Design a protein with these regions (language model features):
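Alpha-helical transmembrane spans of integral membrane proteins, capturing the lipid-embedded, hydrophobic core
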Residues: 15-23, 41, 45, 81-90, ...
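Membrane-helix interfacial "entry" motifs
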Residues: 3, 7, 29, 33, ...
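Non-cytosolic membrane-interface motifs at loop->transmembrane helix junctions
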Residues: 33-40, 106-113, 176-186
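Transmembrane helix-loop-helix hairpins at the membrane interface
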Residues: 118-223
Length: 223
């Protein structure tokens, strides 16, 4: 358990405010007419860098490290976890196609069509990188990384992954949507484990990019 006597109160209060805002914004996804879930990433990034500023004064190691990227990648078990979303992306599409008879691929395309330019490959590659990096800074770097200072890891991992999955809800049948957000939850748990082991959201971002790129490539081949 964290030693609360050693935690800066300003950082704790700032973290709680950021967590609350991200949670509320994610939950608005349940009501399509009210959905403001797209703001969760912006809020998470903002609070991440505010807390990084506080941490720098306290000489606390950053959760976004370029210089130690390769050293963090080589930490025990990290590379295997980074590559795991390649398998989950393929399995998600294969199982989804078997269960929903092609409707799952259409559902994913519909969910991502407004954010990704499938007809412009160079732009699509940039969008995949930016989207994954932004989500990792917000959800792993801030929500998971900063909340882990005041709460147990697995509680933070499950809560952040649940909200992350809810923020990706898209219209469709109950079964289709439930399967989609469950697999997003699974991937999010993997990213959380990567962050826990590496302490660097650039590493979880790499895994996120690889996983998304694999899924999109398979979708384009399938379509």
């Amino acid at each position: 358990m964290p030693d609360f006597a050693k935690i800066d109160k300003k950082s704790v209060y700032t973290t709680i405010i950021g967590l609350f805002l991200m949670a509320v914004l994610s939950l608005t996804k349940i009501i399509p007419e009210l959905s403001l879930s797209g703001l969760t990433v912006l809020i998470g990034i903002l609070f991440f860098f505010v807390l990084e500023h506080f941490d720098k004064k306290s000489h606390i190691e950053s959760g976004l490290r370029f210089k130690s990227f390769f050293d963090d990648l080589k930490k025990q078990g990290v590379i295997l976890l980074v590559l795991l979303p390649v398998g989950t992306a393929a399995a998600t599409l294969l199982i989804g196609d078997m269960i929903f008879k092609g409707a799952f691929a259409s559902h994913i395309l519909g969910r991502t069509d407004g954010m990704l330019s499938f007809d412009k490959i160079p732009l699509l590659m940039v969008q995949i990188v930016i989207a994954a990096l932004g989500e990792e800074i917000a959800w792993r770097g801030f929500f998971l990384g900063k909340s882990m200072r005041i709460l147990p890891f697995w509680l933070c991992a499950i809560l952040s992954s649940l909200l992350f999955a809810i923020a990706h809800i898209s219209s469709g049948s109950v079964g289709l949507v439930s399967y989609d957000i469950f697999m997003i939850f699974v991937d999010s748990i993997i990213y959380a484990m990567i962050y826990k082991k590496s302490g660097n959201c650039l590493i979880s971002a790499l895994s996120h990019i690889i996983g998304n790129a694999t899924g999109i490539l398979l979708l384009m081949m399938y379509s």
